[in-house]
């Protein structure tokens, strides 16, 4: 087992309310045994102190109130900690090594020879790690409800604890009402702490071993090696299997326990650095404390820092979150609205979306409702959480959304002929544009200033930087371009130096380099404007932008521009007029697409087809147009869109983007600084 050390946790209850010293981390413990281990750690490393509370919820509340800083929690408690009233986030995951990594298997275990299966548990005595915990409660109870073993219609009918009490003969589920049947088998106070001997994995197993219960809901590593031969796993198909067959016989694979703290990157880094710096102490052993799994699981091999944008939803994943919600929220009743919630990025898109909502009313109900977020990544999160349903995004964002489990369902078509006679997949050309006569070529861009549509965008980042990376094999693009504007970078990056912000006299800097229309150099039009206003020497955009913005077609800032004032930079080192994009481009790439959750595909497609029949380019209702720039350029959809076309059902993001694009993306993903924090969070683990 890899030895990791956690810093000392000095402190005592009397100092709980004192403001922490600079660089101090206060760990929350839930029992005297954990406190003893915590104090022993304090003898090894300065900078930690201990805060004693009675259970996980009290620790969560203490961290929220800044009376403590961190605690390791299981998935069920991570969910609670992430709710709006606490707003904590997982920052470090336990790593169990081998194939488990930062996930583990939730299993049901019984003594060998007892001859009942998972579907025969009614009337049996059960041992649970704790009420609301992952392997001990949420997964087994959620599974039993799903397969119809436990009859429960939702909390509007009765609490799930009542249904579980009716199902099992008796139980020990620490954290339940002490006088209830769910505490009948417990040996101590039935609290969710080590004050209850049957609490946690080792306690639930002890409950089974002692004969108090007939089945224990635990994790796959709980049964000691010397005792495995005496126990068996209960599989969901009602068969049994040896303890080591957990990969094929388990209830679910769930995210590892994780350290949670407040949403403060500096505090998260401090906690991680303290843990990694501890020496001469085995952080993952509870030997000598007459208990197991104190502060961390004893089976932990390592600790892994999570991406800073990871929240409880991203860490736990949509499937596990759905399981928890099914046990804690009322089931949906009544008729739901036949509307889709569109996610608008920034104020300008929200204004257009609100107008769409008003015009979409049919028979007294709107077909489009609006949610807004500051960035596309935040919209993707909202769609994952079911707070929004859909948004149209560029190919790079389709890639990120796909990594987060969303799917492309409709694609923008820029050729009107193909709207009525679909054929080749909708696409556009990614191009590099410079001012005519600048002397620049594709091969002389090093040291110049660059204008990008945004970090992670197709034409503006992924294609040009992928080509540059393939040539230089250097991920530090600040050594290639001297500075530029690539909205989405940290504001102190050289790739934000040339960004303009909102242009407002008050509070404008807050929008600088933000990946939304509030940043004037964001998106296709913004990147072109960056070039026009001499903030950059080259703009990476799509082939239609120059003609759309020049020769009298553009906004005020582009009024006097001629398309002939600009030229394309070809990969062979030559330049060509902007009309020669078919011979002079960086790549031909998929058009922008509407993304949603897989289960929402049908409804989103149906409503959008209906909406474009009314408000599309050839729509029956002239009061609103989905694709015209009446509210500003390229809002909600590209202005060049002629129609939306359905993507064949079952198409995943990889198939939509195509092999060439996927190869380019995989190459660029060798550079961590070209991967968004959201994508890192979504791909951190897949349980």
UniProtKB/Swiss-Prot annotation:
Which coarse location class applies to the principal site listed for this UniProt protein?
secreted
Give all cystine bridges in this chain: 28-50, 127-207, 172-186, 235-249, 343-379, 353-370, 404-682, 419-643, 451-530, 475-671, 485-499, 496-513, 570-584
Which positions bind hydrogencarbonate 2? 453, 457, 459-460
List of glycosylated residues: 169, 673
The UniProt entry, under InterPro entries, shows: Transferrin, Transferrin-like_dom, Transferrin_Fe_BS
Subunit structure and binding partners: Monomer.
Q: What is this protein called?
A: Serotransferrin
Gene encoding it?
tf
């Amino acid at each position: 087992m890899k030895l990791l050390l956690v810093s000392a946790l000095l402190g005592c209850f009397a100092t709980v309310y004192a403001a922490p010293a600079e660089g101090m981390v206060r760990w929350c413990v839930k029992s005297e045994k954990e406190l003893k281990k915590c104090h022993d750690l304090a003898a090894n490393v300065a900078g930690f102190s201990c805060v004693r509370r009675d259970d996980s919820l009290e620790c969560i509340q203490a961290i929220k109130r800044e009376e403590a800083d961190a605690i390791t929690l299981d998935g069920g408690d991570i969910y609670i900690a992430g709710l709006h009233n606490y707003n904590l986030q997982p920052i470090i995951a336990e790593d169990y090594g081998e194939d488990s990594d930062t996930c583990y298997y939730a299993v049901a275990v019984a003594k060998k020879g007892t001859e009942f299966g998972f579907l025969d548990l009614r009337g049996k005595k059960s041992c649970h790690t704790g009420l609301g915990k992952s392997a001990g409660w949420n997964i087994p109870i959620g599974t039993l409800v799903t397969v119809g073993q436990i009859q429960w219609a939702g909390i509007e009918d009765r609490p799930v604890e009542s249904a579980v009490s009716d199902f099992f003969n008796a139980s020990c589920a620490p954290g339940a009402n002490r006088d209830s049947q769910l505490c009948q088998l417990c040996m101590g106070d039935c609290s969710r702490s080590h004050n209850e001997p049957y609490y946690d994995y080792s306690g639930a197993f002890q409950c089974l071993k002692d004969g108090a219960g007939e089945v224990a809901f635990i994790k796959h590593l709980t049964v000691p090696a010397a005792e495995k031969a005496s126990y068996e796993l209960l599989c969901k198909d009602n068969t049994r299997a040896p303890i080591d067959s957990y990969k094929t016989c388990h209830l679910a694979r769930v995210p590892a326990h994780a350290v949670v703290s407040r949403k403060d990157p500096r505090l998260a880094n401090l906690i991680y650095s303290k843990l990694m710096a501890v020496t001469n102490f085995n952080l993952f052993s509870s030997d000598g404390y007459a208990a197991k799994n104190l502060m961390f699981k004893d089976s932990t091999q390592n600790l892994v820092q999570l991406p800073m944008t990871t929240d409880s939803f991203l860490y736990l994943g949509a499937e596990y979150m759905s399981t928890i919600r099914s046990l804690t929220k009322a089931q949906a009743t009544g008729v739901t609205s036949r509307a889709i919630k569109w996610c608008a990025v920034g104020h300008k898109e929200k204004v257009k979306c609100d107008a769409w909502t008003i015009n979409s009313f049919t028979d007294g109900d709107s077909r489009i409702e609006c949610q807004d977020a500051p960035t596309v990544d935040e919209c993707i999160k909202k769609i994952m959480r079911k707070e929004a349903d859909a948004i149209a995004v560029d190919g790079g964002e389709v890639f990120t959304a796909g990594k987060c489990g969303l799917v492309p369902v409709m694609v923008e078509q820029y050729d009107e002929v193909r709207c009525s006679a679909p054929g080749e997949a909708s696409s556009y050309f990614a191009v590099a544009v410079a001012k005519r006569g600048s002397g620049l070529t594709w091969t002389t861009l090093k040291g110049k200033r660059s204008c990008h549509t945004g970090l992670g965008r197709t034409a503006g980042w992924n294609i040009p930087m992928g080509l540059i990376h393939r040539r230089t094999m250097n991920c530090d693009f600040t050594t290639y371009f001297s500075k530029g504007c690539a909205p989405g970078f940290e504001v102190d990056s050289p790739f934000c130096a040339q960004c303009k912000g909102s242009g407002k006299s008050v509070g404008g800097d807050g929008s600088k380099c933000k990946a939304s229309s509030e940043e004037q150099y964001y998106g296709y039009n913004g990147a072109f404007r960056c070039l026009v206003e001499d903030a950059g020497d080259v703009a990476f955009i799509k082939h239609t932008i120059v003609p759309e913005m020049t020769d009298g077609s553009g906004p005020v800032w582009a009024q006097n521009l001629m398309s002939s004032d600009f030229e394309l930079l070809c990969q062979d080192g030559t330049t060509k007029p902007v009309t020669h994009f078919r011979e002079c481009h960086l790549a031909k790439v998929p058009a922008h697409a509407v993304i949603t959750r897989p289960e929402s595909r049908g409804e989103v497609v149906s409503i959008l087809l209906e909406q474009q029949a009314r408000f599309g380019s050839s729509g029956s209702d002239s009061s609103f147009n989905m694709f015209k720039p009446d509210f500003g350029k390229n809002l909600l959809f590209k202005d060049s869109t002629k129609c939306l076309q359905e993507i064949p059902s079952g198409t995943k993001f990889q198939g939509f983007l195509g092999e060439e694009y996927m190869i380019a993306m995989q190459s660029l993903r060798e550079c961590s600084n070209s991967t968004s924090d959201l994508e890192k969070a979504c791909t951190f683990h897949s349980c």
